[in-house]
Amino acid sequence: PVITGQAHISGDGWKDSQNTEELLGTTGQKKGIEAVKLNVGTVGNQFTGGIEYQAHVQDVGWQNWTNTGNIAGTTGQSKHIEAMRIRLTGEVAQYADVYYRMHVANFGWLGWAKNGQDAGTSGYGYQVEAMQIKLVPKNTAAPGSTANAFKKAPPRIVNDMQIRANMYSSSTPYLILVNRSTHRVGIFRGWQGNWQSIQY
């Protein structure tokens, strides 16, 4: 089986259908994907089934699931896609896993998600600029790292503490801050300018 797709790019409109293992969208051009259509085809129609997908759209959130050949996302509204979920249906889902990863503004390529998992970001307002989608035989290894396939922005109050944390240095790889207005403790790992929240 092979997945083909079309992307609707900000400022460019619909691109020609192509094999999604290569790339849907663009990198290095700061152009967001606003909508996608996906299809799954099998050589000689040896499998039945199809593909379902769901887009997380700027200022909208998660749309409903749609399927083979239909549009996920929006056109004519200047709203970019921020995340995707993709899954196989029918017989093809018994023999293959679908892996996909997003190239997101300010983050670049994220890790691989599979079979309906979230891929992309939420809460940052960052656009998906490109995506790769691959089919692999069921229960075989991912095409690459699956770490950080989806990044959800921390709540504002945690984010404020993160910003404050990055003003401080520590003689250890850890930093502890106390938010006196909320009476919460934040624990960070890393170094000055690159503290990552591990507990709040």
Q: What does each of the following model-derived ranges do?
A:
Residues P1-R156:
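Lectin-type carbohydrate-recognition ectodomains
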Residues R156-Y200:
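Cell wall/extracellular polymer interaction/catalysis modules
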